[in-house]
Structures are given as structure tokens and as C-alpha cells.
């Protein structure tokens, strides 16, 4: 079991390091892999608050979705453009977040939220990577 956890941790570290260099690249073939499932979700952005629901200070690279707290969210545009990998460590009070049909991405300020919404047009494809627990 310990080996599986170590391998999983290595995979997560690799994904996070790749996300910094691969942002904006297109991978439409990723949607063709039958072993990987994606959810098409509404996507919003927020820039308020200081501490997440899990006690983590807010920072770019986190997102909120009540059903997936503790998981990683790999976000793509519908054309396969890679947006990044986000740690889901926050929740929200909106019905969409509670039902898990929205992913809310933290941005450092209002201008970054507006940029995010223009980029995504309010829709993303999400691959969830289960976290521990």
C-alpha cells in the first residue's frame, strides 16, 4: 500500500510540474482515450477570501467543488487546450457548487477572474484525479 501511495504522490508531483510548462498547449487526443473520463462543467472564478474550507490559504492553483474536495482537477477547454491542474480544497454555497456541476477557480484579483471567464467562456472539461481518503 505504501508503494502505491508513493507512486501516486510522484504522479501528482509530475502533473503539477508539467502544468506550469504546458499551460495553453492543445491536447485534443486526450478526449479520445476511453480509459479517461471527463466532465463538462460550468466554470466560474473567484478572488475573495483568505482561507479555504479545508484550511489552506487561498492562492492561484486551487478550485472549489463540493463533491471533489481533496481531488485534483485537470482543466481543459473544449478544443483540448490545457488550462492547468488545480487542487480542489474549497467549497462554496452556490447550488451549482453543492451539486458538483460547477468548478470555481481561484484567481488573485478581479482582473484575473475576468480574463479567466473570457478564456473559458464559462465552460471547461475536467478530469478528476482522486486524492487521498
Residue locations for each model-derived region?
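Generic short amphipathic/hydrophobic targeting helices enriched at N-termini
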Residues: 6-9, 32
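Sec/Tat signal peptide C-region and signal peptidase I cleavage site
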Residues: 18-21
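Solvent-exposed, well-ordered loop and adjacent helix/strand elements within mature globular domains
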Residues: 23-133
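Positively charged n-region of N-terminal signal peptides that target proteins for export
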Residues: 1-4
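Bacterial N-terminal signal peptides
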Residues: 8-16
